């Protein structure tokens, strides 16, 4: 396989790994990177599933101790069952809304103006959330969440169906606005990412199954590995970062990137369509 193509796959994997779990929208960055690299044909949809799988493996590895402990304790411990139930409750709204409105959203909302607007608006929402964070915290750990808290965050996660919103951004900032601490909101966002991304990946793989080819396995493998490594490093870094810092820098980054979306679309440099 062409070495240049494998290099592009590695770059796309790194972009996915670095942006999937930060509140900055991986989709917007993948479209921009794919367009600039010429890595945006029909098979790119299947490739996106591969690199997203690498990111999922990374967050599972980071939280493996907690995941394993929960699975082992499910038959005997009420807290483990409550935690698993909260993840399930948070996951379901996105499933239902995705099945009902997914096609319509992709058909009508994937435009430069929408993507840029959600990037910029999301930046200002982060700034607002951080301003009220200290006074609003009532939940300091994921284990303190109620099923109603989980449902509310799950409903907020549905906003991520709008291009440019960011799934992690919606759940983390939404959680903070609902009273979760920065750490609790981030942890729950990552736990919620596991079933959400797996479900989305399986559904997308089924839809795009006609594009699968054994010849593309090396390409997908490179993307998956680089996505896994970069996502693992990114998640571990973010968990350390939020113990000392706020999400304000990500807010300004989103606002700037939204302007980049508009500039690249108006110049014709990037085609902002899925």
UniProtKB/Swiss-Prot annotation:
Alphabetically list the UniProt keywords. Answer: Antibiotic resistance, Cell inner membrane, Cell membrane, Cell shape, Cell wall biogenesis/degradation, Hydrolase, Membrane, Peptidoglycan synthesis, Transmembrane, Transmembrane helix
What does the record give as EC number?
Answer: 3.6.1.27
Q: What class of enzyme is it?
A: hydrolase
Q: Does the keyword Transmembrane apply?
A: yes
Provide the reaction this enzyme catalyses. Answer: di-trans,octa-cis-undecaprenyl diphosphate + H2O = di-trans,octa-cis-undecaprenyl phosphate + phosphate + H(+)
This protein's source sits in the domain of life called Bacteria
Q: Which residues cross the membrane?
A: 44-64, 85-105, 109-129, 185-205, 215-235, 250-270
Q: Name one GO cellular component term.
A: plasma membrane
- Compartments where found: Cell inner membrane
Q: How would you describe this protein's topology in the membrane?
A: Multi-pass membrane protein
Single annotated GO MF: undecaprenyl-diphosphatase activity
The GO biological-process annotations, alphabetized, read as:
cell wall organization; peptidoglycan biosynthetic process; regulation of cell shape; response to antibiotic
Q: What does this protein do?
A: Catalyzes the dephosphorylation of undecaprenyl diphosphate (UPP). Confers resistance to bacitracin.
Family designation: Belongs to the UppP family.
Q: Which HAMAP family match?
A: Undec_diphosphatase
The name this protein goes by in its record:
Undecaprenyl-diphosphatase
Lineage, opening ranks: Bacteria, Pseudomonadati, Pseudomonadota, Betaproteobacteria, Burkholderiales
Q: Which gene encodes it?
A: uppP
């Amino acid at each position: 396989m062409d070495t240049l193509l494998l290099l592009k796959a590695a770059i796309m994997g790194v972009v996915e790994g670095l942006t999937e779990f930060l509140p900055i929208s991986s989709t917007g960055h993948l479209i921009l990177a794919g367009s600039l690299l010429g890595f945006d044909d029909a098979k790119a949809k299947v490739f996106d599933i591969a690199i997203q799988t690498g990111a999922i493996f990374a967050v599972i590895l980071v939280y493996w101790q907690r995941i394993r402990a929960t699975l082992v304790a499910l038959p005997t411990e009420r807290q483990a069952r409550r935690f698993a139930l909260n993840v399930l409750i948070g996951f379901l709204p996105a499933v239902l809304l995705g099945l009902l409105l997914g096609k319509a959203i992709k058909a009508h909302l994937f435009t430069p103006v929408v993507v840029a607007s959600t990037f910029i608006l999301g930046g200002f929402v982060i700034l607002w959330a951080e301003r009220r964070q200290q006074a609003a915290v009532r939940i300091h750990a994921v284990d303190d969440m109620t099923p109603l808290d989980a449902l509310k965050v799950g409903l907020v996660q549905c906003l991520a169906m709008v291009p440019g919103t960011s799934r992690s951004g919606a759940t983390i900032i939404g959680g903070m606005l609902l009273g979760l601490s920065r750490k609790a909101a981030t942890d729950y966002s990552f736990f919620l990412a596991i079933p959400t991304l797996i479900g989305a990946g399986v559904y997308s793989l089924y839809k795009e199954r006609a594009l699968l080819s054994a010849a593309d396995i090396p390409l997908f493998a490179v993307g998956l590995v680089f996505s896994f490594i970069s996502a693992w490093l990114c998640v571990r870094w973010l968990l350390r970062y939020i113990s000392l810092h706020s999400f304000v820098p990500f807010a300004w980054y989103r606002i700037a990137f939204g302007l980049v979306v508009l500039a690249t679309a108006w110049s014709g440099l990037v085609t902002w369509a899925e």
